[in-house]
Curated annotation (Swiss-Prot):
InterPro entries: ArsR-like_HTH (IPR011991), RibK_CTP-dep (IPR039063), Riboflavin_kinase_archaeal (IPR023470), Riboflavin_kinase_CTP-dep (IPR023602), Riboflavin_kinase_dom_sf (IPR023465), WH-like_DNA-bd_sf (IPR036388), WH_DNA-bd_sf (IPR036390). Its cofactor is Mg(2+). Signal peptide: none annotated. FMN binds at T190, E198. It comes from Methanocorpusculum labreanum (strain ATCC 43576 / DSM 4855 / Z). Transmembrane segments: none annotated. Belongs to the archaeal riboflavin kinase family. Residues 1-94 are annotated as: H-T-H motif-like. Binds 1 Mg(2+) ion per subunit. Its EC number is 2.7.1.161. Residues 95-222 are annotated as: Riboflavin kinase. This is Riboflavin kinase. Keywords: Flavoprotein, FMN, Kinase, Magnesium, Metal-binding, Nucleotide-binding, Transferase. It is an enzyme of class 2 (transferase).
Length: 222
């Protein structure tokens, strides 16, 4: 994961405030320098540094330079926001979990393909889950946060019995990843260690977010 210095981070925040997370914004180095109180040359170096760190992308058109905050840039800003939230003790508390994508054993795909569970999750979470789960290995600090989340109000997904076997209940809590509605699911019986969470969504998250093994993700609850 690329890291950036404080000056580059300030530049990234300014681009985001100008709308760079929503789409490409026309931005000259002179205008950026004026807003940040730095020279045009320094502003140009800041943009080059952010582009090298893959926090932004730039395109040159006849009407000027357009700058877009990339997904990596958004995730950096989300982590920064989470730090400020801790400092100022934001109420209606948001819990932020950070971790990396890992492969599962296919258990989630099996359960998310069962019509009963699909219907329950659609009713309780507001989306029909993609048949599969995104497995995330939490970093050590997020493991502690995840434990604190057990005191929150989780939604119970009832179990059921068919002619062959009994399917146990599960619990879930709504969350988002890069703005996409999701839910953390905890089966009644789970084989995962405490540092692993399973996330469901109405979309294939790996494809939608271009995630690969060990990609870093930020999960926001609340």
């Amino acid at each position: 994961m690329e890291t950036i210095d404080a000056e580059d981070a300030a530049c990234l925040r300014r681009i985001a405030l100008l709308g760079g997370c929503k789409g490409p914004v026309r931005l000259s180095t002179q205008a950026l320098g004026d807003q940040l109180g730095i020279s045009q040359q320094t502003a140009s170096r800041r943009l080059q540094s952010l582009e090298k760190a893959q926090m932004i992308s730039r395109t040159a058109e006849s009407t000027g330079q357009y700058v877009l905050v990339t997904r990596s840039g958004e995730e950096h800003l989300r982590r920064e926001f989470a730090e400020y939230a801790k400092i100022f003790d934001v109420k209606d508390e948001q819990y932020v979990l950070t971790g990396t994508v890992m492969s599962g054993v296919g258990e989630g795909r099996y359960y998310m393909s069962i019509p009963h569970y699909q219907e329950q999750f659609e009713k309780l979470c507001g989306f029909t889950p993609y048949p599969g789960t995104l497995n995330i290995k939490l970093n050590p600090q997020s493991v502690l946060i995840r434990k604190r989340m057990d005191s929150l109000e989780w939604t119970i997904v009832p179990g059921f019995k068919d002619e062959h076997r009994m399917f146990g209940e599960a619990r879930c809590i709504k969350c988002t990843i890069s703005g996409i509605p999701c839910a953390i699911v905890v089966p009644g019986r789970t084989h995962h260690p405490e540092e692993v969470i399973e996330v469901i969504s109405g979309t294939q998250l790996r494809d939608a977010l271009d995630l690969t093994e060990n990609s870093e993700v930020v999960v926001v609850i609340g």
